Amino acid sequence: YFENNSMKSFHQGIGWDKTQSEYQKELFPSKDGYVYKRYGYIDKTKLRYAGNFDIKPRGDYKKQRQFIKDEVCGYTPSEIAVAVGLSAVVNGRIQDIVHTPNLIVHFYGDSSRGKTTAAQLAVSVAGVPDIQRTSLFMSWNATSNAIIARLKMNHGMPVAMDEISKYNGNQMSAVVYALSDGRDRERLNKDATLRTTDKSDSFTTVIVSTGESTLIGKCNN
């Protein structure tokens, strides 16, 4: 027999819904665990996120606001980090209008200067800031294909990639271009026709990077 359960819907994308379907408009989790829709709230039991990132709300909202007030406001580097993280929401929205590339912000300098902490602060406005498989805070220790695959269908949530020296792949410049462009390189089908891409293959966000060397210097090498 069939158990009488309510129907549940899932979405893999996060941020601004690029498909503009009838049911999904804005897919941002709020502090109370609901997914926000343009004209109201969608009950979380009806719409669940099944994508790449751990974005489940944690902690206490009031304590987080107090932390921002006490520890961030008035200290310019921390204010910049939070502003960069929040700008992903704006960037994800305006790209279809002004067609700007993804913003890549690279924090560089000597070790133990707070680069990683600043990157964690930037992504903490949207999700878990610890390095783990489903976190918005990632490591450069990955292949270019894995990096691009992790970012797909993200249209408004900031991501961070820690320590650029850990990237051992080739063609660093090509990776940076792909991150800025918001999609992988164009490819051909078996019949030599250009493979079509859709919104599920793209991403529009802000990417925070860290390292002791500059991003341009790494590309030149």
Which positions does each model-derived feature cover?
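Secondary-structure capping and boundary motifs in well-ordered enzyme cores
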Residues: 74-78, 110-114, 118, 149-156, ...
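Ser/Thr/Asn(+Pro)-rich, low-complexity disordered segments
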Residues: 27-29, 36-40, 83, 101, ...
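Switch/connector loops and helix/strand junctions flanking conserved nucleotide-binding motifs
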Residues: 115, 168, 215-219
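AAA+/P-loop NTPase substrate/partner-engagement loops
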Residues: 108, 117-172
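Conserved glycine-centered beta->alpha loop in an early N-terminal alpha/beta scaffold
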Residues: 1-76, 149-150, 154-157, 220
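P-loop NTPase catalytic core of nucleic-acid-dependent motor ATPases
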Residues: 35-132
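Short, glycine/acidic-rich hinge or "gate" loops at secondary-structure transitions
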Residues: 11, 95-110, 188-201
